[in-house]
């Protein structure tokens, strides 16, 4: 008989979106204590960049921002956990307590088959997609094969996705329905400033460069869209230099409607 106790590992996830687990809740709690992402990152054992990226993912995942922060490098930049973030921390704690009680009952005499447990753990599966944006459908135009779906992201920002007509029908897409828009960072093109001129990509999100991370070949750019929303692009290092992209510089993210994948909660 296995004497090792069951350990609860609570994870919350909407379909197609990154999970929110105890590690992210601990990060939120640390931000609330320290008032900076850098201090919180040190406490929970993350790099500053990983913690900053996690905050961006959380803010994109929820309707209201969980953290309001200003980039300030590894030693600066204030951060504040919002009321929505505090509510998530409290709610997650209640769920963890309930799960612990349920596990106590499970250990009392019920032995779940290994395959059943594996099925449960699969619910916490992560996605490699870099950009997951919570949106609201504003219009659906159905065609014979494809459907054009218009989405509201934030005040002043909207997206368009082109998916199959069958997918739009099966998902029940209609104005007011909440969805998640998934866009690979490598699909996002960047233009300096707010007017990219004539281009066929119908999705144009203008913001301010919040962070730049250079690699030997590629550069990751995080664009602040306002209202604590952001989008990430991976472009060549040469292109980033040619465009003069640096924190504080305005830029526009461009991507095709066909590169937007939609997922529902």
Swiss-Prot record:
Domain of life: Bacteria
UniProt KW keywords: Molybdenum, Repeat, Transport
GO biological process entries: molybdate ion transport
GO molecular function: DNA-binding transcription factor activity; identical protein binding; molybdenum ion binding
PROSITE patterns xref list: MOP
Residue ranges the record marks as coiled coil: none
SUPFAM superfamilies: MOP-like, Winged helix' DNA-binding domain
Ranges of residues in domain Mop: 126-192, 198-264
Protein family (similarity comment): Belongs to the ModE family.
Protein's recorded name: Molybdenum-pterin-binding protein MopA
Species, as recorded: Rhodobacter capsulatus (Rhodopseudomonas capsulata)
């Amino acid at each position: 008989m296995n004497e090792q106790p069951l350990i609860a590992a609570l994870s919350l996830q909407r379909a197609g979106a990154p999970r929110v687990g105890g590690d992210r809740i601990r990060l939120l709690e640390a931000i609330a204590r320290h008032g900076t992402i850098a201090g919180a990152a040190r406490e929970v054992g993350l790099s500053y960049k990983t913690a900053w990226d996690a905050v961006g993912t959380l803010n994109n995942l929820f309707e209201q921002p969980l953290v309001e922060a200003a980039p300030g490098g590894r030693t600066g930049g204030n951060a504040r956990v919002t009321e929505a973030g505090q509510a998530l921390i409290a709610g997650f704690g209640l769920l963890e307590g309930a799960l612990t009680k349920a596990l106590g009952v499970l250990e009392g005499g019920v032995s779940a088959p290994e395959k059943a447990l594996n099925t449960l753990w699969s619910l916490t599966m992560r996605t490699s997609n870099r950009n997951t944006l919570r949106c609201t459908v504003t219009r659906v135009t159905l065609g014979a094969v494809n459907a054009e779906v218009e989405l509201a992201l934030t005040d002043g920002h909207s997206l368009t996705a082109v998916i199959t007509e069958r997918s739009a029908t099966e998902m029940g897409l209609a104005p007011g329905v909440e969805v998640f828009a998934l866009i690979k960072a490598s699909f996002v093109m960047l233009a300096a400033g707010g007017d990219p001129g004539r281009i066929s990509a119908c999705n144009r999100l203008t913001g301010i460069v919040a962070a730049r991370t250079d690699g030997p070949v590629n550069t990751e750019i995080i664009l602040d869209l306002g209202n604590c929303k952001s989008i990430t692009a991976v472009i060549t290092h040469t292109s980033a230099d040619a465009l003069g992209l640096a924190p504080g510089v305005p830029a526009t993210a461009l991507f095709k409607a066909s590169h937007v994948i939609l997922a529902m909660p």
